[in-house]
Curated annotation (Swiss-Prot):
Subunit structure: A double ring-shaped homohexamer of HslV is capped on each side by a ring-shaped HslU homohexamer. The assembly of the HslU/HslV complex is dependent on binding of ATP.
Activity-regulation annotation: Allosterically activated by HslU binding.
Free-text function comment from the UniProt entry: Protease subunit of a proteasome-like degradation complex believed to be a general protein degrading machinery.
UniProt KW Hydrolase keyword: yes
Protein name as annotated: ATP-dependent protease subunit HslV
Enzyme superclass (EC): hydrolase
Source organism of the structure: Pseudomonas putida (strain ATCC 47054 / DSM 6125 / CFBP 8728 / NCIMB 11950 / KT2440)
Any single Gene Ontology cellular-component annotation: HslUV protease complex
EC nos: 3.4.25.2
PROSITE patterns (UniProt xref): PROTEASOME_BETA_2 (PS51476)
Pfam families: Proteasome
Domain of life: Bacteria
Length: 176
């Protein structure tokens, strides 16, 4: 699996993920890019779960973004509906985290679209560790969104055997 973290703070949204791809108990790749930009660089997206499934979902989500002129919530809801009702999509095992200047969302294969109330997303095999670390740092420090995401991912990488320290971080100003 993997760990994806997204943090909103002080006019920035940051999303990061580790680079480990595992097949069972074997590390197959250590430098995968699980966080990327979509829709003309205006949306940051990350995935946890089966890699091939996630790429299919990225393509479908980007199609929904194009169809709805980059409106993140509308595109996410439409993807979730499609994911829930399309037989081939309903078998996909992945989750998406997506963020832009307006919102941060988790999209699940059950058709859920969740906007966390504190702007913090942490998912994947190391998600609980990363969430605990990020929440503590958000509440007790003045660190930047990027510093919080990096620290949370590194803590998850120290604890979770399916998460490594080869990080991809994307950052966007909320004013853009």
């Amino acid at each position: 699996m993997t760990t994806i973290v997204s943090v909103r703070r002080n006019g920035k949204v940051v999303m990061g993920g580790d680079g480990q791809v595992s097949l069972g108990n074997t590390v197959m790749k250590g430098n995968a890019k699980k966080v990327r930009r979509l829709y003309h660089g205006q949306v940051i997206a990350g995935f946890a779960g089966a890699t091939a499934d996630a790429f299919t979902l990225f393509e479908r989500f980007e199609g929904q973004l194009e169809k709805h002129q980059g409106h993140l919530v509308r595109a996410a809801v439409e993807l979730a509906k499609e994911w829930r009702t399309d037989r081939s999509l309903s078998r996909l095992e992945a989750m998406l985290a997506v963020a832009n200047k307006d919102a941060s969302l988790i999209i699940t294969g059950n058709g859920d679209v969740v906007e966390p109330e504190d702007g913090l997303i942490a998912m994947g095999s190391g998600g609980a560790y990363a969430q605990a670390a990020a929440r503590a740092l958000l509440n007790k420090t003045d660190l930047s969104a990027r510093e919080i995401a990096e620290t949370a991912l590194n803590i998850a990488g120290d604890i979770c055997v399916f998460t490594n320290h080869n990080l991809t971080i994307e950052e966007q100003d909320l004013a853009d």
